[in-house]
Regions:
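Predominantly a Rossmann-like dinucleotide-binding segment in NAD(P)-dependent oxidoreductases
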Residues: 1-47, 159
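Short amphipathic alpha-helical segments at helix-loop
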Residues: 4-9, 106, 110, 134
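Soluble or luminal CAZymes and related metallo-dependent hydrolases
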Residues: 16, 117, 144
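A general structural signal for well-ordered alpha-helical segments in protein cores
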Residues: 20-21, 119-123, 149
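Generic structural signal for secondary-structure transition and capping sites
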Residues: 29-32, 66, 87, 134, ...
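NAD(P)-dinucleotide binding in Rossmann-like oxidoreductases
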Residues: 39-41, 45-54, 60-122, 166
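C-terminal helix-rich "cap/oligomerization" subdomain common to oxidoreductases
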Residues: 62, 110, 127-167
């Protein structure tokens, strides 16, 4: 079903690329100002009908931060690396439901607390209805993500930088 655009809504960008976008927004505490993107020609035209196989995209963040992202159905990409002015950190694996392992440029161990993100989100939704309060994952966040995804697809189609106006 993941290779059927009608059912899935898109390819790896929609399926797993969203995790890259959310990680960048979370780590920087900001929303992208603009995007550029490229889609690699599919390797199997019978398999990848109407969906991309691999997408490279760049998120331009405030303060000159550039996030270089890649998502694919044919490559196993499961890491996140952040280069900072004073070093780097990485999660590898980054998107597993099980254990996460963080490495840092200074070699200091870093424990990553594991929680069930789905349980946390479902509990928040139930509590928000019960207590008439906002959920931790708002509709605004989902709207933001869809605007970014649409801009990435536009950048792939046009080959141009797409500015975002997200409020």
């Amino acid at each position: 079903w993941r290779l059927n655009k009608t059912i899935a809504g898109g390819g790896p960008l929609i399926d797993v690329g969203i995790y890259c976008i959310q990680a960048v927004c979370y780590i920087t505490g900001a929303t992208p100002l603009a995007v550029t993107a490229q889609s690699v020609p599919v390797s199997d035209k019978k398999k990848f009908i109407g969906v991309e196989e691999t997408v490279y995209f760049q998120l331009e963040m405030p303060g000159g931060v550039i996030a270089n992202c890649r998502t694919s159905f044919s490559e196993e990409i499961g890491y996140l690396k952040v280069n900072c002015s004073n070093g780097w950190f990485e999660l590898n694996p980054a998107y597993n439901f099980g254990g996460l392992k963080m490495n840092t440029s200074d070699g200091k161990p870093f424990d990553v607390q594991i929680t069930s993100q789905q349980a946390t989100q479902l509990d928040s939704m139930a509590l928000s209805v019960q207590n008439n309060k906002p959920s931790i994952s708002s509709g605004e966040m989902g709207k933001r993500d869809m605007i970014i995804l649409a801009a990435i697809y536009e950048a792939i189609e046009t080959g141009k930088r797409v500015e975002l106006k997200i409020h």
